Curated annotation (Swiss-Prot):
Tetradecanoate binds at W83, R107. PROSITE patterns: FABP (PS00214). This is Fatty acid-binding protein, intestinal. The gene is FABP2. Pfam families: Lipocalin (PF00061). It comes from Bos taurus (Bovine).
């Protein structure tokens, strides 16, 4: 699968505005913008393993397409939702457990880069990753 491999964040677009909308304080926003996030993604059939490491934490997330699971963001925000494969895109539809608001994420490969697009309350941000 095209998502398999080690991906290191290269740049962000509108990420601070997105985090502000999410309610993340200014200090955490400044730190998160330079978190050196690395994702190691492996896929076996419908099962994905994502090893996420950054300045803040290292975790392993295992999920199956179409199966709801709970997940915590680096700032502690709790989410519940599922990933689906829509064409060549991984589409995540999540809800915050604290307020019920939707947080949607799309991962796609564009020009050899993995583009992760977040949408929350009308604010869209992108994190662009290069394959290592």
């Amino acid at each position: 699968m095209a998502f398999d491999g080690t991906w290191k964040v290269d740049r962000n677009e509108n990420y601070e505005k997105f985090m502000e909308k999410m309610g993340i304080n200014v200090v955490k926003r400044k730190l998160a913008a330079h978190d050196n996030l690395k994702l190691i993604i492996t896929q076996e059939g419908n099962k994905f393993t994502v090893k996420e490491s950054s300045t803040f934490r290292s975790i392993e997330i295992i999920f199956e397409l179409g199966v709801t699971f709970n997940y915590s963001l680096a700032d502690g925000t709790e989410l519940s939702g599922a990933w689906a494969l829509e064409g060549d895109k991984l589409v995540g539809k999540f809800k915050r457990l604290d307020n019920g608001n939707a947080l949607n994420t799309v991962r796609e490969i564009i020009g050899g880069e993995m583009v992760q697009t977040y949408t929350y309350e009308g604010v869209e941000a992108k994190r662009i990753f290069k394959k290592e």
